[in-house]
C-alpha cells in the first residue's frame, strides 16, 4: 500500500527513522503484513543493529509466508549478522534455489567468502554480475571484502 511505498522511499532517501515509524505503523494496523515485518527486520540486520528484534520480526514474516525467498534472504542475513554462518548459508541457499536473485546471490557469496569458500563465493558474484553489471550491492560488497570476481 501507500504507507509501505512511503517507507521504502524513506529508506532510499536514507531517512531510516521515517521508514521505521511507517513500518511500525503498518505492523500495528495490519499485523499479518509480512512485507512490513521483513522490511523492518532486514533494515536492522543490514545496518547490523537491533539484531534480536530483527530476528523476531523476520521470524514473524516467515510464519506468515514461509516460502517467500526474500524473507529467507532476510533470515539468512540476520543469521549471518549474528555469527551463525551455517544457518545463514542454509537459508540463503534455499532462497537462491527458489529465486536466483542478484541480492540473494551477493549475500550468499559473502557468507561463503567469510566461511573460506572463496571460489564458490566468486561464482555467485560472477552470476550476479552477469544479471546486473551495475549492482551497487555487488560493487560495495566486493570493495568491502577486498574481493574480485
What are these regions (language model features)?
Residues 1, 34-43:
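Amphipathic alpha-helical repeat scaffolds of TPR domains
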Residues 2, 36, 71, 104-105, ...:
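TPR alpha-solenoid repeat register
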Residues 8, 33, 42-43, 68, 77, 101-102, 110, 135, ...:
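Residue-level recognition of tetratricopeptide repeat
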Residues 12-25, 47-60, 82-94, 116-127:
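Structural signature of tandem alpha-helical TPR/SEL1-like repeats
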Residues 29, 63-64, 97-98, 131:
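Structural marker of alpha-solenoid helical repeat scaffolds
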Residues 49, 102, 107, 113-114, ...:
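Terminal, low-structured helical/coil segments at or just beyond the last alpha-helical repeat
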Amino acid at each position: 500500500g501507500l504507507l509501505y511505498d512511503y517507507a521504502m522511499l524513506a529508506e532510499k532517501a536514507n531517512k531510516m527513522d521515517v521508514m521505521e515509524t511507517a513500518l511500525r505503523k503498518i505492523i500495528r494496523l495490519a499485523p499479518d503484513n509480512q512485507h512490513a515485518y521483513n522490511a523492518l527486520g532486514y533494515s536492522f540486520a543490514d545496518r547490523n543493529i537491533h539484531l534480536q528484534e530483527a530476528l523476531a520480526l523476520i521470524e514473524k514474516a516467515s510464519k506468515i509466508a514461509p516460502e517467500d525467498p526474500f524473507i529467507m534472504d532476510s533470515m539468512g542475513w540476520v543469521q549471518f549478522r549474528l555469527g551463525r554462518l551455517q544457518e545463514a548459508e542454509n537459508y540463503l541457499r534455499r532462497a537462491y534455489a527458489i529465486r536466483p536473485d542478484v541480492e540473494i546471490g551477493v549475500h550468499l557469496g559473502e557468507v561463503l567468502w567469510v566461511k573460506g569458500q572463496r571460489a564458490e563465493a566468486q561464482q555467485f558474484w560472477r552470476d550476479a554480475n552477469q544479471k546486473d553489471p551495475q549492482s551497487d550491492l555487488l560493487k560495495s560488497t566486493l570493495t568491502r571484502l577486498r574481493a574480485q570476481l
